[in-house]
Amino acid sequence: MAEVGLEGNQPVDLSKHPSGIVPTLQNIVSTVNLDCKLDLKAIALQARNAEYNPKRFAAVIMRIREPKTTALIFASGKMVCTGAKSEQSSKLAARKYARIIQKLGFDAKFKDFKIQNIVGSCDVKFPIRLEGLAYSHGAFSSYEPELFPGLIYRMKQPKIVLLIFVSGKIVLTGAKVRDETYTAFENIYPVLTEFRKNQQ
């Protein structure tokens, strides 16, 4: 059964996903500029979903339930939002955090919203010979099983880092748009099938 992304149970568009597998988006990291100076102590005291420990980290950590995300809010007005599962959810969450800051009396705007990183994952459902892959794709691969069980594959085009595990599970990170995630997976899929482990 091919994995299907956010489309629910619609069939996979094979013109876009020839492998029949659509990587699932797991985490979106976005940034926005609230474009005003913030008093982090005041925010932490007034907002019930916020924590601030300046000795540990120079930002307020705020969480909301819907979309389930975490924001890092800096005194400069810069904000990082993590944890959303889609670009739209990430933007919606960032807007919600901006509104919370506005309600606390700050003149927060919503400038330069940008998706910085998309993390996706999928499962090719067959085991992979990582040693062989690392050997034949040495220029792009680093594989040191004593340090980390996955092979790290740095694709040049699109510029995506893939973590490839012997089990056939794949993590893709570094995309700014979801199509880069999809393209990177379609690029690597024939390589993975080439290094498929024959099960005895």
From Swiss-Prot:
<comment type="similarity">
    <text>Belongs to the TBP family.</text>
</comment>
<keyword id="KW-0238">DNA-binding</keyword>
<dbReference type="Pfam" id="PF00352">
    <property type="entry name" value="TBP"/>
</dbReference>
<dbReference type="GO" id="GO:0006352">
    <property type="term" value="P:DNA-templated transcription initiation"/>
</dbReference>
<dbReference type="InterPro" id="IPR000814">
    <property type="entry name" value="TBP"/>
</dbReference>
<protein>
    <recommendedName>
        <fullName>TATA-box-binding protein</fullName>
    </recommendedName>
</protein>
<dbReference type="GO" id="GO:0003677">
    <property type="term" value="F:DNA binding"/>
</dbReference>
<keyword id="KW-0804">Transcription</keyword>
<keyword id="KW-0677">Repeat</keyword>
<dbReference type="InterPro" id="IPR030491">
    <property type="entry name" value="TBP_CS"/>
</dbReference>
<dbReference type="InterPro" id="IPR033710">
    <property type="entry name" value="TBP_eukaryotic"/>
</dbReference>
<feature type="repeat" description="1">
    <location>
        <begin position="25"/>
        <end position="101"/>
    </location>
</feature>
<feature type="repeat" description="2">
    <location>
        <begin position="115"/>
        <end position="192"/>
    </location>
</feature>
<dbReference type="GO" id="GO:0005634">
    <property type="term" value="C:nucleus"/>
</dbReference>
<keyword id="KW-0539">Nucleus</keyword>
<comment type="function">
    <text>General transcription factor that functions at the core of the DNA-binding multiprotein factor TFIID. Binding of TFIID to the TATA box is the initial transcriptional step of the pre-initiation complex (PIC), playing a role in the activation of eukaryotic genes transcribed by RNA polymerase II.</text>
</comment>
<comment type="subunit">
    <text>Belongs to the TFIID complex together with the TBP-associated factors (TAFs). Binds DNA as monomer.</text>
</comment>
<dbReference type="GO" id="GO:0016251">
    <property type="term" value="F:RNA polymerase II general transcription initiation factor activity"/>
</dbReference>
<dbReference type="InterPro" id="IPR012295">
    <property type="entry name" value="TBP_dom_sf"/>
</dbReference>
